[in-house]
Amino acid sequence: MSDPEMGWVPEPPAMTLGASRVELRVSCHGLLDRDTLTKPHPCVLLKLYSDEQWVEVERTEVLRSCSSPVFSRVLAIEYFFEEKQPLQFHVFDAEDGATSPSSDTFLGSTECTLGQIVSQTKVTKPLLLKNGKTAGKSTITIVAEEVSGTNDYVQLTFRAHKLDNKDLFSKSDPFMEIYKTNGDQSDQLVWRTEVVKNNLNPSWEPFRLSLHSLCSCDIHRPLKFLVYDYDSSGKHDFIGEFTSTFQEMQEGTANPGQEMQWDCINPKYRDKKKNYKSSGTVVLAQCTVEKVHTFLDYIMGGCQISFTVAIDFTASNGDPRSSQSLHCLSPRQPNHYLQALRTVGGICQDYDSDKRFPAFGFGARIPPNFEVSHDFAINFDPENPECEEISGVIASYRRCLPQIQLYGPTNVAPIINRVAEPAQREQSTGQATKYSVLLVLTDGVVSDMAETRTAIVRASRLPMSIIIVGVGNADFSDMRLLDGDDGPLRCPKGVPAARDIVQFVPFRDFKDAAPSALAKCVLAEVPRQVVEYYASQGISPGAPRPSTPAMTPSPSP
């Protein structure tokens, strides 16, 4: 029985699913010698492109006289799926006390995105000189690993036995508080149990909290347990205390049915009473860790993001030959369709190993019979609608425009259902190998709203997300209904979506913003949607692929 005045300590806000901390381990092979007598003293400097400039993030240690170094110092960086995060790795010779690359110390560099590294787990690239030529046979290998444990939860169940009685006319009303010791040796309250009334042998309710909250993900961090007799005046009577660590708690309950117990000690009684043993015992009956998988767990476990594009070719876009058309192909300024394709697709392509993307159009009359189609391949190859990289999608879009007649209506359900078919097949495998993301670029209100709602509700049960970017100045109020932010979307028959899989964004909100802002907004929800889907299906990530460089360890610096 719990007392309403004894509230549980609230959990701190959960870490944003889109953000994870990644450690990069770096090694090089075959670095150039700057002179014939000595080998280089290499160091790797990591830079991140942020706010239109390259900024140093981390650097490795310096290794002496080594042309194939394996650095021990990891390069840590925050990872965001929705951002491009371009990286540069500069290798330089620090033999003469150099602290940065120069024309005399530069050994080579390479550039890639953080998304490319985490999606492949291990990347090996040639080092390039400042003139763009390869630095001999020099290579750099980068291995990514997510900082683990930050999302895990632990479930604990405690009871006590023969606690001291602190009440004159009844039994104690015990509750327990758990504290973790901070780096400055101060104690921080992390949990308070409910009060069990009039009971010297209380069994407290099981509770669940994050490993980060309990011990800051440090299993050796000291934990302090204090047991009190509740008093409505707020002056609770101290019964006793004990200390432990999460490691000790795990080891003490490792086997089925195994429990761990501690004497509950009141230091004042211990120091004053010769025959004092304890003020009761506290028993840990259950200690289980619940692994909460992250987006990076799935990506590093081999899950590919399958990206599909659908482009609105209805007449409301305007004649492409007119400068006022939303499909105008001006040599001076890319139209909004092209801008959205480049920014959103440019990020998604880093997570697809073959870099081939199906691209469809809807709402146009297409050759040879010029009948209206709502899911035609923009490369006009219905057997193989895939384009090579996002640049191939853009090239197909440019070639497609002069060959079709913009028409209507704006029917979106057919393309959603088309992408749902392979997602349905993927679901049947029961594995986390491919998650589909459909990008719909449209200029107006959906004509087949009822069918679209039905298609989205069906897709919400599949490994699939839908991003809708509204292009132009139309009234998109109906489109926001699909987003599900104001409550679960329902199909016309009243069946609710299993989860929120649609993100709608009007392009005009980002017209004057940096190109990356649009991608940041529309892709921010994808990591959460991926994790939610696989968690709802009870599907764990695949085993991380082997990532340790098979290289001889470098000599100590």
From Swiss-Prot:
Changing residue 282 to G: Does not inhibit calcium-dependent translocation to the cell membrane. Inhibits calcium-dependent translocation to the cell membrane. Changing residue 231 to N: Does not inhibit calcium-dependent translocation to the cell membrane. Inhibits strongly calcium-dependent translocation to the cell membrane. Leads to the constitutive (calcium-independent) attachment to the cell membrane. Changing residue 33 to N: Does not inhibit calcium-dependent translocation to the cell membrane. GO terms for cellular component: axon; clathrin-coated endocytic vesicle; cytoplasm; dendrite; endosome; membrane; perikaryon; plasma membrane. The keyword Endoplasmic reticulum does not apply. Ca(2+) 1 binds at residues 167, 173, 229, 231. Residues 1-127, 134-263 form the C2 domain. Changing residue 229 to N: Inhibits strongly calcium-dependent translocation to the cell membrane. Leads to the constitutive (calcium-independent) attachment to the cell membrane. Changing residue 173 to N: Inhibits strongly calcium-dependent translocation to the cell membrane. Inhibits strongly calcium-dependent translocation to the cell membrane. Leads to the constitutive (calcium-independent) attachment to the cell membrane. Expressed in the brain. Expressed in pyramidal cells, granule cells, and neurons in the dentate gyrus of the hippocampus and in granule cells of the olfactory bulb (at protein level). Expressed in pyramidal cells of the CA1-CA3 regions, in granule cells of the dentate gyrus, in granule cells of the olfactory bulbs, in the mitral cell layer and in neurons of the cerebral cortex layer II, brainstem and spinal cord. Not detected in glial cells. Its main location: cytoplasm. GO terms for biological process: cell differentiation; cellular response to calcium ion; positive regulation of dendrite extension; postsynaptic actin cytoskeleton organization. Changing residue 287 to A: Does not inhibit calcium-dependent translocation to the cell membrane. Pfam families: C2, Copine. Its cofactor is Ca(2+). Calcium-dependent phospholipid-binding protein that plays a role in calcium-mediated intracellular processes. Binds phospholipid membranes in a calcium-dependent manner. Plays a role in dendrite formation by melanocytes. Belongs to the copine family. This is Copine-6. It comes from Mus musculus (Mouse). The gene is Cpne6.
